[in-house]
């Protein structure tokens, strides 16, 4: 199936189940139920993020951005989860993890509640790659790995797993390099955060104080000095996905404003012009990312 056919099929599904005339229309500001999210994923939503060897599609940056744009057009929760599981789980997982671990995690993504990448912490700076990151792991004498982490997570409060970013600790010395660890649900204690501003997502503080198998470690590089650069690449690439996400959301806002507001009122015309201006800027950024960024190379 070529890109045009794939995107048309996805758009047809979105319109049928989430469009203006659908009885199941999703709210832009309400959390997307897990059964509906799984149904959407079954349409191949995440396959552009997945390498061909695991059943994905030919790498195509425009296709990635179009999927995010389409999802954004039909709801914040949909495009948010698409970006989370695509750019922050599937892409780093399939690039850095061993095949056995990849094959263990992918069914949780495509047939379960999925997961996410846990980076930011409540007890340190909000910067994703801050020197102050407190989460760490230690390789134990028995070969297992001890993980101590406290992370924010936005998605569905508690998913089937988290990919946890942490520093390696050797004795009392905390290393500078960052690696990832696959932590299943049973090792995680979580406390939901309720906020009127977070209706589209479920936010929580997740705490991990557990011993996990050594094979759950995902090294970002065999060379410790390069692991931070690889981690930065994950973070930057995920931020590039925001351009497709927000472009779809802006399109939705523009469509509804033009449809329902009385444009003959002067200040309304001014606001419409402002939205038009922002949509034009968004389109420039969108086209730039589609045409200049590689879907596979470091950014």
Per-region residue spans from a language model:
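N-terminal glycine-rich flavin-associated loop
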Residues: 79-100, 125-128
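A short core secondary-structure module
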Residues: 144, 148-189
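A structural signal for short hydrophobic beta-strand segments in well-ordered beta-sheet cores
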Residues: 135-138
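Amphipathic, small/basic residue-rich leader segments at the start of a protein or domain
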Residues: 1-83, 104
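C-terminal helix-coil-helix/basic helical segment that borders enzyme active sites and/or dimer interfaces
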Residues: 22-28, 258-266, 279-299
């Amino acid at each position: 199936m070529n890109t045009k056919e794939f995107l048309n099929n996805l758009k047809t599904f979105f319109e049928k189940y989430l469009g203006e005339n659908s009885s199941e229309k999703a709210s832009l500001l309400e959390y997307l139920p897990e059964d509906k999210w799984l149904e959407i994923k079954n349409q191949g939503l995440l396959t552009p993020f997945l390498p061909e060897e695991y059943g994905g599609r030919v790498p195509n940056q425009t296709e990635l951005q179009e999927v995010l744009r389409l999802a954004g057009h039909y709801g914040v929760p949909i495009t948010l989860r698409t970006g989370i599981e695509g750019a922050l789980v599937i892409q780093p997982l399939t690039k850095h993890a061993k095949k056995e671990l990849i094959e263990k995690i992918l069914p949780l993504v495509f047939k379960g509640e999925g997961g996410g990448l846990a980076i930011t912490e409540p007890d340190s700076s909000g910067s994703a790659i801050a020197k102050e990151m407190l989460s760490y792991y230690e390789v134990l004498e028995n070969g297992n790995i001890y993980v101590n982490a406290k992370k924010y997570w936005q998605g569905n409060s508690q998913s089937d797993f988290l990919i946890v970013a942490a520093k390696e600790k050797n004795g009392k010395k905390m290393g500078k390099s960052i690696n990832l660890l696959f932590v299943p649900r049973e090792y995680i204690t979580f406390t939901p955060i309720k906020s009127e501003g977070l209706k589209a997502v479920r936010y929580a503080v997740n705490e991990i104080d557990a011993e996990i198998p050594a094979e759950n470690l995902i090294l970002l590089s065999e060379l410790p000095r390069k692991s931070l650069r690889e981690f930065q690449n994950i973070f930057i690439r995920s931020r590039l996905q925001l351009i497709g996400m927000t472009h779809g959301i802006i399109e939705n806002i523009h469509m509804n404003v033009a449809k329902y507001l009385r444009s003959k009122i002067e200040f309304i015309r001014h606001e419409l012009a402002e939205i038009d201006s922002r949509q034009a800027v968004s389109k420039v950024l969108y086209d730039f990312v589609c045409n200049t960024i590689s879907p596979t190379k470091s950014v």
